[in-house]
């Protein structure tokens, strides 16, 4: 029995959300009295995950996973969870993770709760608080399946460093050839995306016209 957490990366580097889900998953592992295993895909410097509580890192290096494919990623994470006898799987709530999580749940025959905002209220039964109705209300949900999947809401737990040193090992999932082929990917690299932004500032008719939008755009560089 263990807790497994998927740590999302981009161009080999971990996102802040990866460290947050590791911090959160470590707290759950401590409550359960078990270990925390992180799984990374084509990421570098996985020792960073130990700083936030990972005891072990399963490193997946696979060219076929260079571009996100929900089914392939779900299969890889599901196989990693099964190899560790994980009873709790923690994911972030990025766009990719939201797309992939239901597929992982199907693979593992697991209950899945998204937009989680706190540690489990109780372990037996497993009850957890999450936001609903576009964050206008909260719900306390009980997961009854043997394997439980948690989607941690962004900035719901924060970063918590520990003194752990993660042990890394290679993991090679068995993947089928994807039906989808990515020809090219174009990304805006000079600005912070809305998904990664700490604060979002909106503006409207008070700015009169597009010639005044510069003052708002400048705030994104502060």
Where do the PLM segments sit?
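N-terminal glycine-rich FAD/FM-binding segment characteristic of electron-transfer flavoproteins
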Residues: 1-222
């Amino acid at each position: 029995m263990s807790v497994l957490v998927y740590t999302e990366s981009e161009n080999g580097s971990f996102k802040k959300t990866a460290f947050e889900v590791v911090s959160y998953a470590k707290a759950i592992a401590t409550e359960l009295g078990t270990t925390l295993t992180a799984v990374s895909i084509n990421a570098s410097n996985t020792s960073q995950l130990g700083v936030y509580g990972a005891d072990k890192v399963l490193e997946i290096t696979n060219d076929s996973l260079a571009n996100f494919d929900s089914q392939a990623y779900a299969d890889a994470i599901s196989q990693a969870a099964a190899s560790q006898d994980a009873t709790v799987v923690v994911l972030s709530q990025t766009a990719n993770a939201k797309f992939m999580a239901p597929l992982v749940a199907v693979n593992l025959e697991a209950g899945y709760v998204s937009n989680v905002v706190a540690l489990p209220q109780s372990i037996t039964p497993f009850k957890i608080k999450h936001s609903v109705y576009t964050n206008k209300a909260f719900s306390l949900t009980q997961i009854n399946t043997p394997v439980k999947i948690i989607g941690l809401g962004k900035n719901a737990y924060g970063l918590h460093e520990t003194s752990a040193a993660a042990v890394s090992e290679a993991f090679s999932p068995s993947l089928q050839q994807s039906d989808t082929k990515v020809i090219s990917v174009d990304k805006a690299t000079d600005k912070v995306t809305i998904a990664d932004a700490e604060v979002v500032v909106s503006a409207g008719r008070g700015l009169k016209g597009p010639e005044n939008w510069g003052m708002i755009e400048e705030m994104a560089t502060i």
